From Swiss-Prot:
The lineage of its organism: Eukaryota, Metazoa, Ecdysozoa, Arthropoda, Hexapoda. The gene is Ublcp1. Residues 136-296 form the FCP1 homology domain. GO terms for biological process: regulation of proteasome assembly. Signal peptide: none annotated. GO terms for cellular component: nucleus. The keyword Cell membrane does not apply. The keyword Metal-binding applies. Keywords: Hydrolase, Magnesium, Metal-binding, Nucleus, Protein phosphatase. It comes from Drosophila melanogaster (Fruit fly). This is Ubiquitin-like domain-containing CTD phosphatase 1. Its EC number is 3.1.3.16. Dephosphorylates 26S nuclear proteasomes, thereby decreasing their proteolytic activity. Recruited to the 19S regulatory particle of the 26S proteasome where it dephosphorylates 19S component Rpt1 which impairs Rpt1 ATPase activity and disrupts 26S proteasome assembly. Its cofactor is Mg(2+). It comes from the Eukaryota. It catalyses: O-phospho-L-seryl-[protein] + H2O = L-seryl-[protein] + phosphate; O-phospho-L-threonyl-[protein] + H2O = L-threonyl-[protein] + phosphate.
Length: 320
């Protein structure tokens, strides 16, 4: 199936926002991408001139069926939550509530090999600009790390960033750096990633180096039955730009399993670090994971053979 790229120009609040899609995406995906650009939630968007057979296009209609002209300009009306005084605020952990896929192997497989989503990955490879902070090192494996709730409790109040840092963070990164090049990938803006890395002392630590940061714009949106549209972190973006890394030598940590949908075998769901003030004294997750990373780096030549859901039970003699 040939997948064609489509650009829709959304006109809203006096500005224009280009939205990159494929012709196999649906109106629901379009709304999700508009939300990423404008922060106007899909249910609040009124797409004035998006028609299908003379009527307002339903969410399940494919972009290809709309027969849009190149650089079609879409008129939108809608308000952000911040602009609606009586709007109910969303729960802080709404993402974590709805996005676990613990029993979703078939769904993962269908997403991973979808031509539509692979085309989106290729677009990220083409358009995303990586700012390299440290060069890759020969013979090293790749560790990709989330930030929020993985390395850092970003919701609890504190005087300093170190109060919210997951215990043993610097020891973990120092140990991992012996065998892995390290990449930070967060579903936030680059400005916030850089600020958090500065606050945590990661950016300035002499014992290890982060190769580069990836932000939310390197992610892609996928449609999952019964879940709707979600954003995921496709490792193919990194693998295409750095050929020495692939599924055999890459592992990614995140507290949200849906981020692994494009690369389910490469992801390890870490226990989220919340309520830092209560859990700082007992959280040893990073210490245990340091041991796991070291063992698989030294004893497992192909990470595809691993089941990261059972990482706590890995024994080199039995698994290598």
């Amino acid at each position: 199936m040939e997948v064609k790229e489509v650009v829709v120009i959304v006109k809203w609040s006096g500005k224009e926002y280009p939205v990159d899609l494929t012709d196999q995406d649906t109106v629901e995906v379009l709304r999700h991408e508009i939300f990423r650009k404008t922060q106007v939630r899909p249910e609040r968007q009124k797409l004035l001139n998006l028609k299908y057979k003379g009527k307002t296009a339903a969410d399940n209609v494919k972009i290809s069926a709309l027969e849009l002209k190149p650089n079609f300009k879409l008129m939108m009306v809608g308000s952000t939550e911040a602009d609606i005084e009586d709007a109910c605020s969303l729960p802080d952990n709404i993402g974590e509530v709805v996005d676990d896929f613990d029993d979703a192997d078939e769904r993962e497989e269908s997403v991973e090999h979808s031509a539509v989503y692979l085309a989106k990955v290729q677009r990220r490879v083409r358009d995303y600009k990586i700012k390299e902070l440290a060069p890759p090192r020969e013979g090293k494996k790749l560790l990709v790390l989330d930030i929020d709730y993985t390395l850092f409790d970003h919701r609890s109040p504190a005087e300093t960033g170190t109060e919210l840092m997951r215990p043993y963070l610097h020891e973990f990164l120092t140990s991992a750096y012996e065998d892995y090049d390290i990449v930070i990938w967060s579903a936030t803006s680059m400005r916030w990633i850089e600020e958090k890395m500065r606050l945590l002392g990661v950016a300035s630590n002499d014992n290890y180096k982060v190769m580069f940061y990836l932000d939310s714009t390197a992610m892609i949106s996928v449609h999952v039955p019964e879940r709707g549209v979600v954003d995921v972190k496709p490792l193919g973006v990194i693998w295409a730009l750095y050929k020495q890394y692939n599924s055999s030598n890459t592992i990614m940590f995140d507290d949200i399993r849906r981020n692994f949908l494009m690369n389910p075998k490469s992801g390890l769901k870490i226990r989220p670090f919340r309520q830092a003030h209560l859990n700082r004294g007992t959280d040893t997750e990073l210490l245990k994971l340091s041991d796991y990373l070291r063992k698989i780096a030294h004893h497992c030549p192909d990470f595809n053979s691993l089941n990261h859901r059972k990482w706590e039970h890995y024994h080199p003699k039995k698994n290598s």
